[in-house]
Amino acid sequence: MTQEKMYPHLFSERCANQHQHRTAEEKKYVSEKQLIHWRCEEPSAHHNSIDIKRMKHFGSALRLRQTFHLDTADHPCVITMNPALPWKLEGSNSTSTLPLPA
């Protein structure tokens, strides 16, 4: 299966002037940072608006989105959870992991 078929929303993006399409061949050779930059320029429901604001604010997409990979299983938009934050169960006073089913 080609990358274009797997990720049609990536390959259907338009250039900033809205008249010229980027080809699949171009997409193949662009850097990860440039691809994220293109995606940030375009309004889309697929994007996390907070991530886009952060990327524009700090100016480096790769510093914030090191988990962005084109070969992600079903969708290239990756949602990550910060492992440094303790996750608490509702009603619990201490941090713990969810119990596994027996």
UniProtKB/Swiss-Prot annotation:
According to its UniProt record, in which tissues is this protein expressed? Answer: Expressed in normal and neoplastic endometrial tissues.
What domain of life does the UniProt record list for this protein's source? Answer: Eukaryota
**Induction trigger:** Down-regulated in endometrial and colorectal tumor samples.
- Reported function: May act as a potential tumor suppressor.
Give the protein's recorded name. Protein CASC2, isoform 3
The record lists the organism as Homo sapiens
